[in-house]
Amino acid sequence: GLTTPTEKIQDTGRLQLPEEEHYPYGDFHPQCWIYRQYGGNHGWEDLADALRDSCNIYFYTMGHRLGIDKIDEYASLFGLGEYTGIELPEVKGYVAGPATSEALGVEWYGGNLLNAAIGQDNTQVTPLQLANYIVTLLNGGDHFVPHLLKSVKSSDYSETVYEQQPEVKNHIALDPANVEAVKRGMWEVANDPKSTVDQYLSNLAVEVGAKTGSAQVGSADKEADAVFTL
């Protein structure tokens, strides 16, 4: 594989590659949010650390290694930018990539890969797609079709008139060690004092994991929209 759950990536504030590796993005050195806001960095981070801290540099680095084709392949397998199949009107949205840019009539540049790696650029997904993606990841790779109705009972609850059977759309082969690292990172988001949101989630009646996100609105003078998955 291209990495392991325990590999640590150094966040110095701006994306840098090892000296012996060609840097293909010209003068574009995207920054981590902590550098933009506070002039700081996260130092050395593994996968769980990066999830807890939303370390852009870690995921820029992974995006660089994967390439946009592999990112788009897995995004589709997890149902991002695809119809979920729920019994409601829905939109597919987009996952950033050369084909999406062409369809939208905009230019695709190599550096767009880095923005796509953190869910930005032209990526637009629905809350249900996001939730179903997390479920698929954490259950070990079974991508289910979501449904509104679980079952129908008779008026006295003595009989089940209808019961929706689980419907697996596809299965993704996931390394259990990787899944456990993601679970640990999401647990730390909700419970580790180093997290920016643990104060809101660590004392709930039910122990939870979470992931924060920022849906940027394309304007520097407007606040980004916050998104949470629990």
Language model region names:
Residues 2-230:
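Beta-lactam-recognizing serine transpeptidase/beta-lactamase-like catalytic domain environment
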